Amino acid sequence: MAKLSLAEQISQLANPKPKDVDIENFEDRDDGSESGGDVDYDSDLATEHYVKVGKSKLRDDAPALNPKYKAGKVSRKALYDDEDEDGDGADGFIDEDDEDDEEDDEEGEGNGFIDDEVEVDEEDQDEDGDEDMEDEQDEDESDEELSENENDSSARATLKELLREEKKASKQQAKEAIVSDAQKGFAIHKQTDLYETLLDARITFQKAVQSANALPISDTKAEELGEDITNTLQDTKAKLSDFISQIAKMRHNMAVQDNVFAADSVKLSTKRTFDATLDNMDKLDTEFKAYETSVLSKWSQKVQASSAASALNSSKFKALNQSSANQVAATLADMDRLVKRTRMNRSNVVILGEEQMGAIQDAEGENYYIFDDSDFYRNLLKDLIDRRMVDSGSQSSGVKTWTATKAKTKKNVDTRASKGRKLRYHVQDKVQNFAAPRPVFTWEDDQIDELFAGLLGQRVNFNEDDDGEEKEKEEKEEKEEQELVIPDDGLRIFG
């Protein structure tokens, strides 16, 4: 650009050109005027009561692209090797041209002498040697690149195979865990059903146990009741004996099936006497003792390990922190007390043939012909009721949760917003730079009324007592005026 003269510089200062502004470039626009700042300030004031919200989470920052469009990773060594190959190729091309030019010059300068021919042959040999060296280097580099590519591809294939195997193993482990949890849940559900079935049977037998306490003590008493009753009692005894024998056989078969003991190790008696029945039960209880203790200890330890109750409770001597086997052993240690509690006639049952129960019970109220386990029966009923209440509560809470979830998932759609059936409105911005008046003076209402009455040139009496006196005076004057009126003497001129 040519240098401006003094006259041109003066003319530019006298008549400056306006600044060229790109109206489409919103980022670099800067008017430099103070009004722009005021407008921005006013707009901020108009929207300062709006709720500040963050960026919407409906769209991600980066677009969702297919993984095949992602760029591949290249090592730095491979990048520099490619550049070196390009440079070597260019240098070799230039060198060959230069050599050809030199050969042409030498041929033009030479006169066909032998010395010139010898020099040309030597140069050709040197060129052939250089080309062979370059070819060998190129082959070595290409071999190295191929080996590196093969190593990279093999490493990638190995890594993919390892990842595939790891993913497969994790899926298999998750599947096995799900199957194991399902089997455990099914086993627990089955055990719960079996326990409830036994509990229902025990509740059903309670009436039979209570009725058995009213049976006669001796055969002579039964004979006195009559032949029909005697036959009924004999049939009942036979059925009970068969029932106890079946229970003993069932316990024996279940123990053999679960490998608790061998089938030949315990032989049950086939006699139906009372002593034989007790002997069979004692044998089974003795064989089951070790198995029951091991099973109770095993599952008690698992339950305590899964729950943090044992870790939180520092005292290990509490009953809750001990194993189930120890708790059962501690409860059965005082067997005399437990047996004595079952010989109390709490239901006031009267034995058939006896008029009173006092004759066959001792001073402490213990009756050897009574079996009453009402305490244990009440505990069973309490556990059953608590379990049923918990189940019903969990079901009701599940229904409530499902209802709440359904209510949340329901779309909030206004059915009246279509076809112009709803008033559409826009929230107006609040008034700017406005402050409502706030009373800061301490005048009372009487003082304010007196002030404004004085300004208007009137006098107002704010004393209520004076008003009452004036009213009394007015009433007295009205009464006096009424007394001065001429009384009615009964004379009427018109009709």
From Swiss-Prot:
Q: Where is the composition biased (Basic and acidic residues)?
A: 46-62
Q: Which InterPro entries match?
A: AATF, AATF/Bfr2, AATF_C
**Name of a matching Pfam family:** AATF-Che1
Taking the first listed entry, what is the main subcellular location of this protein, grouped into a coarse class? nucleus
Location comes to: Nucleus, Nucleolus
**Disordered: region residues:** 10-155, 462-495
Q: Which domain of life is it from?
A: Eukaryota
Q: Cellular component GO terms, alphabetically? A: nucleolus
Give a GO biological-process term. maturation of SSU-rRNA from tricistronic rRNA transcript (SSU-rRNA, 5.8S rRNA, LSU-rRNA)
Q: Where is the composition biased (Acidic residues)?
A: 23-45, 81-151
Q: Which UniProt keywords apply?
A: Nucleus
Protein family per UniProt:
Belongs to the AATF family.
What name does UniProt use for this protein?
A: Protein BFR2
Question: What is the species of this protein?
Answer: Yarrowia lipolytica (strain CLIB 122 / E 150)
**What taxonomic lineage is listed for the species of origin?**
Eukaryota, Fungi, Dikarya, Ascomycota, Saccharomycotina
